[in-house]
Amino acid sequence: MPRRSYSVIGRVQGVGFRSWTRRTALRLDLRGWVRNEPDGTVRLCADGTDEALATLETALRKGPMFSRVDHVVKHDDPAHEGPLPDTFDIRFRAPGSASE
């Protein structure tokens, strides 16, 4: 299955973005993870069908209520994100960060 990795830039922390992303991904039968980054962005990696990933990307550009998405960056090499879980998880720390 195709895999995609994104960084979402804007007001995306403290507004329920990770929970919303998880619900959206599960509804689309995607697996992967989402986490807050120390720089204030949200990072995620998902795999599934091309159609489901395209729907997720469209949703990410809008975001949930109370968020403001300024930009979505699609990363070229999501394979370096490592193995994905069997479902879609919220991760609480970026590798090497001391806080959420």
UniProtKB/Swiss-Prot annotation:
Reaction equation(s) it catalyzes: an acyl phosphate + H2O = a carboxylate + phosphate + H(+)
Annotated stretches, region: Disordered: 76-100
Top-rank lineage group of the source organism: Bacteria
EC class of the enzyme, as a word: hydrolase
Stretches of the chain forming a coiled coil according to its record: none
Pfam families: Acylphosphatase
Active-site residues from the entry: 18, 36
Keyword Zinc-finger applies: no
InterPro entries for the chain: Acylphosphatase, Acylphosphatase-like_dom, Acylphosphatase-like_dom_sf, Acylphosphatase_CS
Keyword Disulfide bond: no
Stated family: Belongs to the acylphosphatase family.
Protein name (record): Acylphosphatase
Organism ancestry: Bacteria, Pseudomonadati, Thermodesulfobacteriota, Desulfovibrionia, Desulfovibrionales
